[in-house]
């Protein structure tokens, strides 16, 4: 009996040792799996946080621009270009008023947005933007009446460091203003216009406000066109030039122009 008891005790000890080893191995495996799960979870969290940070930067960048837009206006168009020749892309914002009384019926009995437009110019700097010039109401609405034709279309662009504001009126020609940053504002330094009948140029005007000289070119063959089409010229365009010396005046500031539609030069 004593011998049997000893054998039983030995077997119980062996079983306990084996069970302990299995539990230890299982514990190691569980720990490894838990650590792997935690690591994977941290990677997912890190990725989400990174994406969130990027979205935050995008929003912050947009906020730096829109912070310059006054209450009661919305962004109509954004144009980029180096306007102070420092190698950085500056920002031109065309804004539009959002007044409720600006919505009216046109001649076709259709409700259109006649709110006026303006311009904000921002210079790009290392830590954001700096206001260079602003004029909140100098442009008419894009939905003005165009008579038998559509309303003139405003084009804004940067060329060789200068700001160009061009009104295109299809077959009737265009007129364009050239501004250059000087001192603390954008100054009007040039003006061009063409007067067309379809492809036929009737006349051209070019003014250099720096030199105070105006050039008026008149097509002396303007009356020679195809009578059936009232458009196609039958003779080459030949221009007669008249040079006009303008009175010396201070350059016009972009920020001080009340209405481009009423701007006249003498």
Regions found by a protein language model. Name each.
Residues 22-35, 42-45, 153-266:
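Acidic, small-residue rich beta-repeat scaffolds with periodic aromatic anchors
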Residues 34, 38-71, 127-148:
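Blade-edge motifs of beta-propeller repeat domains
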Residues 102-136, 179-181:
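Beta-propeller blade repeat segments, especially FG-GAP/WD-type strand-to-loop junctions
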Residues 1-9:
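Bacterial N-terminal signal peptides that target proteins for export
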């Amino acid at each position: 009996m004593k011998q049997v008891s000893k054998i039983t005790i030995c077997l119980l000890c062996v079983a306990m040792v084996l069970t302990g080893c299995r539990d230890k191995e299982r514990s190691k495996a569980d720990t490894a799996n838990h650590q792997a799960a935690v690591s994977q979870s941290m990677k997912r969290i890190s990725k989400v946080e990174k994406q969130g940070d990027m979205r935050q930067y995008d929003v912050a960048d947009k906020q730096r621009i829109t912070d310059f837009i006054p209450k009661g206006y919305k962004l109509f168009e954004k144009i980029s270009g180096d306007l102070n020749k420092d190698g950085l892309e500056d920002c031109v914002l065309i804004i539009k008023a959002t007044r409720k009384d600006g919505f009216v019926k046109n001649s076709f009995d259709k409700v259109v947005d006649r709110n006026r437009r303006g311009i904000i110019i921002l210079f790009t700097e290392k830590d954001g933007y700096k206001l260079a010039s602003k004029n909140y109401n100098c442009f008419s609405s894009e939905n003005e009446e165009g008579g038998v034709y559509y309303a003139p279309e405003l084009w804004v662009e940067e060329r060789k460091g200068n700001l160009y504001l061009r009104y295109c009126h299809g077959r009737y020609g265009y007129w364009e203003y050239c501004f250059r940053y000087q001192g603390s504002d954008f100054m009007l330094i040039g003006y061009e216009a063409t007067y067309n009948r379809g492809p036929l140029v009737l006349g051209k005007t070019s003014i250099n406000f720096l030199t105070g000289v105006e050039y008026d070119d008149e097509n002396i063959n303007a009356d020679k066109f195809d009578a059936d089409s009232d458009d196609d010229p039958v003779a080459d365009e030949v221009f007669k030039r008249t040079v006009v010396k303008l009175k010396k005046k201070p350059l016009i500031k972009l920020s001080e122009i009340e209405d481009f539609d009423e701007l006249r030069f003498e």
